[in-house]
């Protein structure tokens, strides 16, 4: 149901934040500075 979807989304979000945090920050920085 919807609750399990929310759980999966939260878990995916945590995993992404942990694994992709550094990449995400670099991506945001390059977007802001138009260096991508």
UniProtKB/Swiss-Prot annotation:
Coiled coil ranges: none
Subcellular localization: Secreted
Record Pfam families: Antimicrobial_2 (PF08023)
Keyword Secreted attributed: yes
Tissue expression notes: Expressed by the skin glands.
Cellular component, GO, one term: extracellular region
Main location: secreted
Annotated GO biological process: defense response to bacterium
Disulphide-bonded residues: 30-36
Keywords: Amphibian defense peptide, Antibiotic, Antimicrobial, Disulfide bond, Secreted
Role description: Antimicrobial peptide.
Family: Belongs to the frog skin active peptide (FSAP) family. Esculentin subfamily.
Protein name: Esculentin-2R
Organism ancestry: Eukaryota, Metazoa, Chordata, Craniata, Vertebrata
């Amino acid at each position: 149901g919807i609750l399990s979807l929310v759980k999966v989304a939260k878990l995916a979000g945590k995993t992404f934040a942990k694994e992709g945090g550094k990449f995400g920050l670099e991506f945001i920085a390059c977007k802001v500075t138009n260096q991508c």
